[in-house]
Amino acid sequence: MQPLRFLVLSPSGIKLDQAIISAQVKTTNGYLGLNYNRAPLIAAVQSHFCKILFANNTRRNAIIGAGLVLIKKTEAKIFTENFVFEDEIDLEATLKRKAELERQMNHSKDLKLNIKIEQNLMFELLKLSNKQR
């Protein structure tokens, strides 16, 4: 099977740039399988738990925040602010970040800021729920 170039891009840089066999991405219309030679597509991505099978046949799980996916025949790019591999989650830092986001939400009156805080809080909650499995 041909590998697909898989990139996860964020404002802080390239989080992942590797060849994969497949990955599952949750869009607003449901889950989407990524693999080589897929029809081009642009879709909104929801925060989700993602299973990735790399070209070297290793598997890793990741948590991807809300964003956008751009799919071409030979590559897929996800644009998001939040991405972390399951085995790299720091439980203590995640709990601190969650508490800080909850505090910010309780004190904010700005609707746009609250939406941003909610997206980041959702990502932290996904990390915590994944660690408890």
Curated annotation (Swiss-Prot):
**Taxonomically, which superkingdom?**
Bacteria
- Is Acetylation found in the keyword set? no
By its UniProt entry, which SUPFAM superfamilies does this protein fall under? Epsilon subunit of F1F0-ATP synthase N-terminal domain (SSF51344)
Give the range the annotation lists for the signal sequence.
none
Record has Cell membrane as a keyword:
yes
Q: Which UniProt keywords apply?
A: ATP synthesis, Cell membrane, CF(1), Hydrogen ion transport, Ion transport, Membrane, Transport
Where does the UniProt annotation locate this protein?
Answer: Cell membrane
GO MF terms on file?
Answer: ATP binding; proton-transporting ATP synthase activity, rotational mechanism
**Pfam families assigned:** ATP-synt_DE_N
Q: Name one GO cellular component term.
A: proton-transporting ATP synthase complex
Protein's membrane topology: Peripheral membrane protein
Which protein family is named in the record?
Belongs to the ATPase epsilon chain family.
Protein function? Produces ATP from ADP in the presence of a proton gradient across the membrane.
Tell me how this protein assembles: F-type ATPases have 2 components, CF(1) - the catalytic core - and CF(0) - the membrane proton channel. CF(1) has five subunits: alpha(3), beta(3), gamma(1), delta(1), epsilon(1). CF(0) has three main subunits: a, b and c.
What is this protein identified as?
ATP synthase epsilon chain
Query: What is the scientific name of the source organism?
Result: Mycoplasma pneumoniae (strain ATCC 29342 / M129 / Subtype 1) (Mycoplasmoides pneumoniae)
